């Protein structure tokens, strides 16, 4: 079985991001939006729930790179299996999948209602000495992302200034 590399810091950042997305979403639709963590078998992080009804799915990522740095690499790199899960959820439910990415305190969002636009490359990370960290990846153009009025400081969400 493959090890999980999720650290306490990662979980804290993801939790803070989820809380801020809930607050942002609630303000946008004027209804209480809850992000409910899904079991790992679903392949995506959260179900977005309003009034007990699943209205969408969400994947949350926290990265230590800036928008410009990721853009210079050709886009946001997402494992092909994750892209496959996004497509499956869209096709099987008819619901959108939202990708939220926190980059150095700024939050970006891409909404997928169909197959995401991406360039297929072979890549990954090489800092953990795990050969399974490399494989087919989708580079999603940063032009697919919209910056949200959510700002992170010291891992705590605050309203944008």
Please identify what each model-predicted range represents.
Residues 5, 9, 20-23, 52, ...:
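Non-catalytic C-terminal interaction segments of nucleic acid-processing enzymes
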Residues 42:
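Beta-rich catalytic cores
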Residues 37-39, 99-106:
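Acidic carboxylate-rich catalytic motifs and surrounding loops in phosphoryl-/glycosyl-chemistry enzymes
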Residues 57-59, 97-102:
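A structural signal for short, well-ordered beta-strand segments and their strand-loop junctions
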Residues 83, 87-100, 109-112:
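Acidic, metal/cofactor-coordinating or nucleic-acid-engaging core segments within structured domains
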Residues 63-85:
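Mg2+/Mn2+-dependent nuclease catalytic core
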Residues 1-38:
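Acidic-basic catalytic patches of nuclease active cores, encompassing PD-(D/E)XK
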